[in-house]
């Protein structure tokens, strides 16, 4: 019998039981994830350029927003948002917006890492029901002080501030590590 097949037959039941055990509290039959705890990592002021409207596609309305720079800071990290990233958006037929942003951050010590931010934006009947949550994938150098960013799940929020007259457009992204 093939070694890979034997391996799969042996480990799949173990893995599936282990996953089930991690997700369900056997005493209450509740998800263990209902009480997430997070740690604030940074807040970024991300400057954005003029929207490039691609138009209607088979999936909805496509647009791209250039990321032109910015800054970020948190209790253990501080630096700049490098220009050159992009925020790809899809406005779905139901009105929600899917966001895929990819950009680089550079710390004050010169360490550069990549951020991929996947978000969902939903605006309800009133502007008070604005919902925007994201999951971030952060790729940092392993051998530096920020290698810990490679080993966690990060959640984010997005705020659209009111701009002052002649102020360059920007968004505020807050990032939290799931503990």
Question: What are these regions, as identified by a protein language model?
Answer:
Residues 1-24:
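Bacterial Sec-dependent N-terminal signal peptides
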Residues 22-179:
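Beta-strand-enriched cores of mature, soluble protein domains
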